Amino acid sequence: MKTKQQVVVVGLGRFGGNVARTLYQLGHDVMAIDIDEERVQTLMGEVTYPVAGDATQEAVLRELGVHNFDIGIVGIGANIEASIMVSVLFQTMNLPFIVARAHSALHGNTLRRLGCHRVIHAEEEMGSRLAHSLFNPDVEEYMELAEAFGVSRLQVPDRFTNMTLDEAGFASA
């Protein structure tokens, strides 16, 4: 994967806006598109190309050169129809990698069948992360890999500093 990617983010609510802003801060070229001019204005100077436009229109996306981008992210909020339309347009334009936010299991299944490479269930993922870290202050982050398996990033307690896993009692874990 190239170090600097060209990413288009459609839907600039809390989810899409934060994704666009963070990707730009990480050094990627980011085109951020939303039909709401005010949302676009809030990202001025925080993304490479802030654009007000209707991303459900193929002509708009083609005029913007979206077909030349490496990654397409569909962060559209509650409008499931628009989410599906943009996902199909990204697929039609042969974007190499498409990520879409789903609002339900059925919506997620639909996005996968449409060819989205990664489907995000933001609320479910955050709920799972909170549940795994709430009563364990050493858990900084949690990522579910499968239904019964996950990976945690832990803050190492001082008592384990300079110890091997075996010495700390984790050899069989």
Listing of model-derived features with the role each one plays in the protein:
Residues M1-A173:
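Cytosolic regulatory regions of ion transport systems
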